């Protein structure tokens, strides 16, 4: 019994390195797509007629450059209108009181008025 067991051990030990050195290549099953193959075959077999300039004549509009823009018309055109504009009186919201001599006196007003806040002891 021992001689048979020892033979098996020796046989397995001698085959073991060969099993490790074997390299198995696995391949996947090749799947064919029949519809895709038919489509690609039809694409390869299709011959299109080359397009010419006469084909595009009915489908494309000819290019025309845009028109140059006109100058806008302004209300104040000409030197007379400019002179009339400069001679106009300036309208202001503040009407100055005229003094007895006929000259208007400038009135000085405070343009920045700050209200003094009352400080209370509670706020400190």
From Swiss-Prot:
Alphabetical UniProt keywords: ATP synthesis, CF(0), Hydrogen ion transport, Ion transport, Membrane, Mitochondrion, Mitochondrion inner membrane, Transit peptide, Transport
InterPro entries registered for this protein in UniProt: ATP_synth_F0_suH
Keyword ATP-binding: no
This protein's record includes keyword Membrane: yes
Skewed-composition ranges (Acidic residues): 100-124
Region (Disordered): 89-124
Location relative to the cell: Mitochondrion; Mitochondrion inner membrane
A single cellular component GO annotation: mitochondrion
One BP term from GO: proton transmembrane transport
Transmembrane segments: none
Transit peptide start-stop: 1-32
Note in the entry: Present with 6140 molecules/cell in log phase SD medium.
Function: Mitochondrial membrane ATP synthase (F(1)F(0) ATP synthase or Complex V) produces ATP from ADP in the presence of a proton gradient across the membrane which is generated by electron transport complexes of the respiratory chain. F-type ATPases consist of two structural domains, F(1) - containing the extramembraneous catalytic core and F(0) - containing the membrane proton channel, linked together by a central stalk and a peripheral stalk. During catalysis, ATP synthesis in the catalytic domain of F(1) is coupled via a rotary mechanism of the central stalk subunits to proton translocation.
Subunit architecture: F-type ATPases have 2 components, CF(1) - the catalytic core - and CF(0) - the membrane proton channel. In yeast, the dimeric form of ATP synthase consists of 17 polypeptides: alpha, beta, gamma, delta, epsilon, 4 (B), 5 (OSCP), 6 (A), 8, 9 (C), d, E (Tim11), f, g, h, i/j and k.
Family per similarity comment: Belongs to the ATPase h subunit family.
Protein name: ATP synthase subunit H, mitochondrial
